[in-house]
From Swiss-Prot:
It catalyses: (2E)-geranyl diphosphate = (1R,5R)-alpha-pinene + diphosphate; (2E)-geranyl diphosphate = (4S)-limonene + diphosphate; (2E)-geranyl diphosphate = sabinene + diphosphate; (2E)-geranyl diphosphate = beta-phellandrene + diphosphate. Belongs to the terpene synthase family. Tpsb subfamily. It comes from Cannabis sativa. Expressed in glandular trichomes two to four weeks after flowering onset. Mg(2+) 2 binds at residues 313, 317. The gene is TPS2FN. This is (+)-alpha-pinene synthase TPS2FN. Involved in monoterpene (C10) olefins biosynthesis, constituants of cannabinoids and terpenoids-rich resins. Catalyzes mainly the conversion of (2E)-geranyl diphosphate to (+)-alpha-pinene, and also produces minor products such as camphene, sabinene, beta-phellandrene, (-)-limonene and isoterpinolene. Pathway: Secondary metabolite biosynthesis; terpenoid biosynthesis; Terpene metabolism; (-)-alpha-pinene biosynthesis; (-)-alpha-pinene from geranyl diphosphate: step 1/1.
């Protein structure tokens, strides 16, 4: 049993420490435990199953290819396509076969772009040259497209974000469509064009493309917009609303479980006054990474991991002295409970909680997979703490890294690798040595890309506040210091890097990988969640109106039926 006796190094009375002045959490334990979880069991399950069968018949019985593609798109945006994964794959396979054998009908731009996007999303290698039919003799996209086909331009815009490295046609399509859609919005603002449903979709797309959006947030937004349309399908709408609420009830049960663990750990209760108590926000990340009902265990485990990352990150970033941080890093590397007595008092509870949580998770993996994972789990934490320590040394020495040097360390210190190791064991049915070695050595591109996107999105949303707290330079400031550009120019460069990461992410085929499809999707969804959480600032630490709305929309408040 771990002793919590006072250690020789625990006298901190003369140490002047930084403080981030984090606000206490607005979501109390009692509030979380009072969530009703209303939409579960009968009669909701029976009604959901009935609606699901009706939608399935609708989907597979369609003969018009464009209408069928539009239905798949609508199912995706309503957040219910996961119920029809097998049917959608079977349908799209036929469309891809037609393209491969030159039997595809002659589509207009809208239908071509829609088909292209859906096929790319499901891993089909549709060539970008399919859009050459919409170019003129000079190789430019035809000017006539813009005159009367806003729907087609918007579809091409969304399709262009599935671009991979070297795909110049899709690059040109993105520039072409973005410029036109921005002019279209400007004309709406000047009352030159009707501000209708299409205008709403265009504004939404320019804010962030569909491919980059997180599924549950998009479902909530689209359900509300779809309900306003005149040609809405009542069966689809009812099923989408009911499914959203039933999933939300599962999320509430998951959150209650995690909240009880947090309460028992005593890491809340205002004991960690120097760190962020953001359990609900930590859980929200997991909803975005894997929302499907069968992944409750993943959400419950990963929320713990994210909450612990937040606490330990703040110890390194804000509160600890360099000597104390070196002690904590060594304790994690040694992974011996006896080392807790060498730590300052304020570090003992976080270390003890980490130690117990990791070992508990290793037991779960052993029970499910008959695989001893503790070395992989604790090594991921040791690497994370070493990266934290490196940044602490930069801070205390006043070192200003280049952007490249910063990214090499910061893409690891953001905690993505820890998250992915736990996701791997939680989401993988059959563990292979090849996949495990690739993950352990950091070779898997989707993990690196997801972590880097998380880091850069975090920096865009939080760097100003973190600098005020006395943190190290972030990517924006590193680039400014290195090149002499303005902050606005530096931020644009970081946004450009994010778009480049997406090209690499698009190269990762989740349907043909040494990793499970569920794990690959989790890697990509971490990138999506990072853009979602930091879109309006620090969506993890801040408890502003944007943050409260995100949590209320996705976890707290059901959609009226």
């Amino acid at each position: 049993m771990c002793s919590l006796a006072k250690s020789p190094s625990s006298d901190t009375s003369t140490i002047v420490r930084r403080s981030a002045n984090y606000d206490p959490p607005i979501w109390s334990f009692d509030f979380i435990q009072s969530l009703p979880c209303k939409y579960k069991g009968e009669p909701y399950t029976s009604r959901s199953n009935k609606l699901k069968e009706e939608v399935k018949k609708m989907l597979v019985g369609m003969e018009n290819s464009l209408v069928q593609l539009e239905l798949i798109d609508t199912l995706q945006r309503l957040g219910i396509s996961y119920h029809f994964e097998n049917e959608i794959i079977s349908i799209l396979k036929k469309y891809f076969t037609n393209i491969s054998t030159n039997k595809n009908p002659k589509y207009d731009l809208y239908a071509t772009a829609l088909e292209f996007r859906l096929l790319r999303e499901y891993g089909y290698a549709v060539p970008q040259e399919i859009f050459n039919d919409f170019k003129d003799e000079t190789g430019k996209f035809k000017a006539s497209i813009k005159n009367d086909d806003i729907k087609g331009v918007l579809a091409l815009y969304e399709a262009s974000f599935y671009v991979k490295n070297g795909e110049n046609i899709l690059e040109e399509a993105r520039v072409f469509t973005t410029e036109y859609l921005k002019r279209y919005v400007m004309m709406i603002d000047q009352n030159m064009i009707l501000n209708d449903n299409m205008a709403i979709l265009v504004r939404h797309a320019l804010e962030m493309p569909l491919h980059w959006r997180t599924i549950r947030a998009e479902a909530k937004w689209f359900i509300e917009e779809y309900e306003k349309t005149q040609d809405k399908n009542g069966t689809l709408l009812e099923f989408a609303k009911l499914d959203f609420n039933m999933l939300q009830s599962i999320f509430q049960e998951d959150l209650k479980h995690v909240s009880r663990w947090w309460e028992h750990s005593k890491l809340g209760k205002n004991k960690m006054v120097y760190a962020r108590d953001r359990l609900v926000e930590a859980f929200l990340w997991q909803v975005g990474i894997r929302f499907e009902p069968q992944f409750s265990h993943f959400r419950r485990i990963s929320a713990r991991i994210y909450a612990l990352i937040t606490i330990i990150d703040d110890i390194y970033d804000v509160y600890g002295t360099l000597e104390e941080l070196e002690l904590f890093t060594k304790a994690v590397e040694r992974w011996d409970v006896k080392t807790v007595d060498e730590l300052p008092d304020y570090m003992k509870l976080p270390f003890f909680t980490l130690f117990n949580t990791v070992n508990e998770m290793a037991y779960d993996v052993l029970e499910e997979h008959n695989f001893v994972s503790v070395e992989y789990l604790k090594n991921s934490w040791a690497e994370l703490c070493r990266c934290y320590l490196e940044e602490a040394k930069w801070f205390y020495s006043g070192y200003k890294p280049t952007l490249k040097k910063y990214i090499e360390n910061a893409s690891l210190s953001i905690g993505g690798q820890v998250i992915f190791v736990y996701a791997f064991f939680s989401l993988t049915k059959s563990i292979t040595n090849e996949a495990l070695e690739s993950l352990q050595e950091g070779h898997y591109a989707a993990c690196r890309q997801g972590s880097l996107m998380l880091r850069l999105a975090d920096d865009l949303g939080t760097s100003s506040d973190e600098l005020k707290r006395g943190d190290i330079l972030k990517s924006v400031q590193c680039y400014m210091h290195e090149t002499g550009v303005s902050e606005d120019e530096a931020r644009e460069h970081i946004k450009f890097l994010i778009s480049e990461i997406w090209k690499e992410m698009n190269d990762e085929d989740e349907y043909n990988s040494i990793f499970s499809k569920e794990f690959v999707q989790a890697c990509k969804n971490l990138g999506r969640m990072s853009l979602f959480m930091y879109q309006h600032g620090d969506g993890h630490a801040s408890q502003d109106s944007h943050s409260r709305k995100r949590i209320s929309d996705l976890i707290i408040n059901p959609i009226p039926l």
